[in-house]
């Protein structure tokens, strides 16, 4: 009798879990800002970098690129080479404005525009469409030697392999030199 009750309960639990609908998300990626963390060395000096954290969902799970994804539309000179697009925004008169960040190039004796854009690896090993969700941490430089005491933000969006673009998220205000800010 006890065995029949146990088997009946196991069957009931199995049926309950097998009837669950799979998670569904839109095919366009969606991201949500989770936070920013400054990276500080053991001696309490600022590294000049931080971690931007955000969560993501994608209905068909086609997020990320392989190293071999070098042909159009993912070629180096193509508009979709990067699957994480990041805009640098500087606080000017109390408002955050998209600003190109420049870096001196000693070879050309001119300034180059710095890009914060990135390529992140595929998040699934298969091309079979399946909804995914998770969290991503991205290490990013925040210190600007040409303007060492700025307040900035980043705007971030991602693209999937089908070139669907996510919503845009924005970080909170970030100090390019948080150690100096604490001393003021």
Regions found by a protein language model. Give the residues of each.
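C-terminal motif of bacterial Sec signal peptides marking the signal peptidase cleavage site
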Residues: 15-18
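Bacterial signal peptide processing site
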Residues: 20-23
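Positively charged n-region of N-terminal signal peptides that target proteins for export
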Residues: 1-5, 10
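First exposed extracellular module after export/assembly in secreted or surface-exposed proteins
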Residues: 30-184
């Amino acid at each position: 009798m006890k065995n029949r009750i146990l088997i009946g309960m196991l069957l009931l639990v199995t049926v309950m879990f097998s009837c669950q609908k799979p998670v569904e998300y839109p095919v366009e990626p969606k991201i949500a800002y989770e936070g920013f963390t400054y990276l500080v060395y053991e001696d309490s000096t600022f590294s000049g970098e931080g971690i931007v954290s955000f969560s993501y969902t994608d209905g068909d799970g086609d997020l990320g690129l392989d190293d071999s994804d070098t042909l159009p539309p993912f070629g180096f000179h193509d508009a979709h080479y990067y699957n994480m697009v990041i805009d640098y925004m500087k606080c000017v008169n109390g408002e955050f404005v998209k600003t190109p960040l420049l870096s001196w190039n000693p070879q050309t004796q001119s300034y180059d525009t710095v890009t914060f854009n990135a390529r992140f690896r595929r998040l699934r090993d298969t091309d079979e469409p399946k909804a995914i969700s998770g969290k991503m941490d991205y290490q990013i430089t925040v210190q600007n030697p040409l303007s060492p005491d700025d307040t900035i933000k980043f705007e971030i969006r991602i693209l999937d392999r089908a070139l669907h673009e996510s919503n845009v998220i924005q970080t909170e205000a970030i100090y390019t030199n948080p150690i100096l800010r604490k001393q003021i």
